[in-house]
Amino acid sequence: WMPEEIHKQKAHWHLPLIESHESIGRKVGYWSDWINHPNYDNYWHDMQPIDENYSNIKVPALSSAGWFDVFLQGTINNFVGTTKFSKNQVAKHNQKMLIGPWVHDLGDRGTISIVGDIDFGPNALIDIRNLEDRWHEYWLKGINNGIMDEPKVKIFVMGKNEWRESNEWPLRETQYTSYFLHSDKGANSLLGDGLLNTLPPNNEKPDIYIYDPNHPVMTIGGSTCCAEENLYAATIGPRDQRINESRPDVLVFSTPILDKEVEVTGPIKLIIYASSS
C-alpha cells in the first residue's frame, strides 16, 4: 500500500494509466510492465502461473471463496484444475471447495448474513473455522473425523438461500442455455429497449455509446477488493445498479418479467463483438 501522504486520487484519475505512478512522484517498475503487457504473453508465462502447472500440485486442498470474492474464479480454477490434471493421486482425489455469499477480506466469513444490500438469511451462517479445523485434524493429525466422506463441493444458492452439495463442478445437472442481446432503438440506460432472451438476433443494429474518461462509470459493488473503510476502494457485494443503469453510456439488457424461477449456477461465457473509435 502507498503511504497516506501520497495523494492517491491524483494517481487514480491520471491518464494515460502507464504514467499514473509518475504523477505522484513515484517510479513503480512492475506497474509499467503490467500496462505494457495487457494480454497473456511470455512475460506472464515466465512467472509460471498456477493454472499452467496443476499437474505438479501434490497436496490436498480445501479451497473457499465467496460469490462476490475478487478471487472467486481462481478458486474454482484451482479446484477443477487440480482435480483434472494433477499427476499426484492423493492431490487429484482430495480437493474440496466451499463457496458462500461472501466478499473478499470480510473477516470471519460465515458469521454474518448481510452482504452488500442483501440479507441471505440464517442459512448463510456457517462455522467455517470448524470445517478448517476438521480438515487440518484429518490431514495433519491423522484423525478420521469423517470430513473426507462428505461431498467435495458445497455452494450457497443465492435466492433460494440454501446450501447445495455435489462431488463435481460444474454441477452434473447443469443445463447450459444460450441467451442473446437485442435492441431496436438502442439499449442505452434503463430507458432503452435492450432485451435479453433465448432468440438469436436477426439483422439488428449495433448499440453505440460515448465514453468520457473524465466521467467514468463508477463501480457499485460486485467482486471488488478489499475494504470499504478505504476511502478509495469501491463498495462491495450485491448492490442496486440503477444509478449506473440510468446513464446513457451504459447499455442495459434485461429479460422480460420472469413467470417462473430461474436458477443461474455455473460457468458463464460471454461472446461480444465490439469496436472503438
In which residue ranges do the predicted regions lie?
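Accessory cap/linker subdomain of secreted extracellular hydrolases
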Residues: 1-56
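C-terminal, loop-rich substrate-recognition/catalytic regions characterized by aromatic stacking residues
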Residues: 11-18, 107, 112-277
